[in-house]
C-alpha cells in the first residue's frame, strides 16, 4: 500500500488545538485552469498568509481551534485524506474553494453554498451572513457611499461583489466531507456558471 502526500499548512490553535477547521481546494486538474482551480489554491494560500500575519502582528488572537489548509488532488485526494485521518471527528468544519476567480466579464456569479440537511450546522448561516455583509458594503461603495469596509483591492475593479447564498450545491471536493461516513459540516465557495471552464 502506497503513501498519499499533499501540500498542507496549519495555524495551531490554543485550547482546542486538537480540533481542526479545514480550508480546502484541489491542487491539480487534467486541463489548464487559472480559475479551476488555481484560483481556489491561491485564495486559501492568501487566507493562510493573511491570518498568520495578523496573528504575528497581534492584530488577531490565535484561534481556539487549529486552522488547517489542504491542497489535495481533487475528490480522490480528499477521500484519501479522510480515510487516512487518525480521527476525522476532530474536523469540525470544512470550507472549500473551487473556482473563486470569476468576474463579471466571465458572466459568472459567486456563490456561498451550505451543506445538506443531513449534516445540520450553523456554518452555512455564518457564511451567508458574512456574504450578505460583503454584498452590502461593496454595493454601497460602488454606488459612491462612504462605507466602513469598502472591501476592494486598490488595483482591482470597483464593481460590487454580489454573492448568492445557496443551500447544498454539489460537484466538487467538498462533497466527500458531507458524506455519511464523515458528516463534516462546511461551506462551498465557488462561481458558476463559468463560460471558460476547461
Where is each model-derived feature located?
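A structural signal for well-ordered alpha-helical segments within the folded catalytic domains
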Residues: 41-45, 175
